[in-house]
């Protein structure tokens, strides 16, 4: 064993010596590096400093267009950071110098123009660094590389980049945004001036200006104003409203053809599909949120809603106040629902597009036959049936949620409506009306239709409060 180790040592020593010689191939390198003997960097050095061929002393690097390479002696110029030494003696200007004895010029590895923080466009990053170094030597602020491409111009996209390949959400938004509208409702105050009292969203379904939105967005029958993505505004007329389905159709008279959105088939949706919600929450136009389909068509049986017209798509895409009426779309840009309500963070609902399709067909038939609907009663509230499962989930998300497992859970109270005037608030749970126990949202709807006045008992926190609400008659 000792003999084997001795033989191995004898073989390796020359190899290690060779490695040292290869590292110190440059003529003139000292045996040991003493940095105290290194010459100072010239003050006019603009390409930055690098270590010399001996990996010992910092020296001024050759800049773009300056000579490089040489005979392999200490002191031969070497290119600075971001540059490479290229020769042009018959082997091409971009061939990197790899052989001793060759000389060339330093060229920038990148030929892409760039923009500096001084607002100037540079041929490449190397030129920017050279100008920045000069500025610092003159006690001026450095120039920062802030953008690929010339100043004032967008960077040319690389089709192979991850951003280009996987930005499918942005592609969807770019496709659908022109057909999404912002809706504002106005009423006159005591001084006979119009003031905005509510807002929402909608989307164009016909080139001549038909727009779909939620019924609760426009049900107050105030003056309705629609603003397009271009900023142009129009007064809208309410063409049809289905309070039960919470869908409305309004129309604007625009002088040009409008971009439209097509309906997809919500019946084909699968849990886990990506969806995009777009609208105007808090009057912030074209606000985009994304998520997945949590459950397809969660409705009557699971939410305790006896009315089969109130089926929902559940999604974790955020839907806020003002986002209502905007489209929920799939990755093909097809509308698969109307953004309708948010129960709590991560639990939002949309009316399925198949329901929208049915509403549009019925609306067309009604208008074709000249049918008019009777007036409907309205209190201005959105609610859903409180089930034990939903109550448990809400208690986990809201510490102050009342200790109740049935009733009608109030999701939103629309401003300037009988519900608000009567004192009803968001997150209240309606537990009885006119002495009758309330176990579902449908019970409340029935009471609104049949009773002139509602004496409602609501659970707010851990307190029962009695409210009086007078339903208002509205045109459909």
Swiss-Prot record:
Q: What class of enzyme is it?
A: hydrolase
| Annotated Pfam families | IGFBP (PF00219), Kazal_2 (PF07648), PDZ_6 (PF17820), Trypsin_2 (PF13365)
Every IGFBP N-terminal domain range: 25-109
Q: What is its EC number?
A: 3.4.21.-
Map out region (Serine protease) in residue numbers: 200-360
Q: Which residues form the signal peptide?
A: 1-19
Cellular localization per UniProt: Secreted; Cytoplasm, Cytosol
Q: Which residues form the PDZ domain?
A: 361-463
Q: Which SMART domains match?
A: IB, KAZAL, PDZ
Instruction: Output a single Gene Ontology CC term carried by this record.
Output: extracellular region
In this chain the Kazal-like domain maps to 94-153
List GO BP terms, alphabetically: positive regulation of apoptotic process; programmed cell death; proteolysis
Q: Which domain of life is it from?
A: Eukaryota
Kindly give the Gene3D superfamilies that the UniProt entry links to this protein: 2.30.42.10, 2.40.10.120, 3.30.60.30, 4.10.40.20
Disulfide bond positions:
29-54, 33-56, 38-57, 45-60, 68-85, 79-106
> Quaternary form?
Forms homotrimers. In the presence of substrate, may form higher-order multimers in a PDZ-independent manner.
Q: Which family does it belong to?
A: Belongs to the peptidase S1C family.
Protein name in UniProt: Serine protease HTRA1B
Q: Which gene encodes it?
A: htra1b
